[in-house]
Amino acid sequence: MEGTRSRVRITVEAEVRPTEDREKVLKAVRNVVEPESVRFEKIGSTEILVGESSTLASLSRLHSILRAERILDAARGAMKKGVQGADRMTIHLHKQAAYKGRLSFVSSDHESPMGAIRITIEHPNVREVIDWLAPPTVRGRPVFERRMPE
């Protein structure tokens, strides 16, 4: 199991704007993802929340919300657009929606007034991760449900 965990890396990043409260940005992130570690980095005048995890279990909330909100098709499309090679994908979520426990996919930081939450998933087979998080659907219902990839 430990060898598998080291092949998985999840990085969550969200800018903390000067008018924002760090705790609210952290809440927005934790409403969607459960990182194992969180830190705040200062890059020039910009502060960024960085969360990291080495297990897909940290995406369990995202998995559940996608089903509760019935947005598997939109999520699958956003995830497929974010694929970078066989082992990496990045998605962007609207920060204010995440704060309220909702999901809204955006294509860039500019679509979220306070900046987006960027989630980068590295896994040996990122397509398996997509199939687990957002399987294909027929009439809004998943064609299959996969177990969490290792």
Swiss-Prot record:
Q: Which family does it belong to?
A: Belongs to the UPF0201 family.
UniProt xrefs under NCBIfam families: PRK00447.1
Query: By its UniProt entry, which HAMAP family does this protein fall under?
Result: UPF0201
Instruction: Name the InterPro entries on file.
Output: PAB1135-like (IPR002739), Ribosomal_uL5_dom_sf (IPR022803)
Q: What is an example of a Pfam family matching this protein? A: RNA_binding
The protein's name is: UPF0201 protein APE_1751
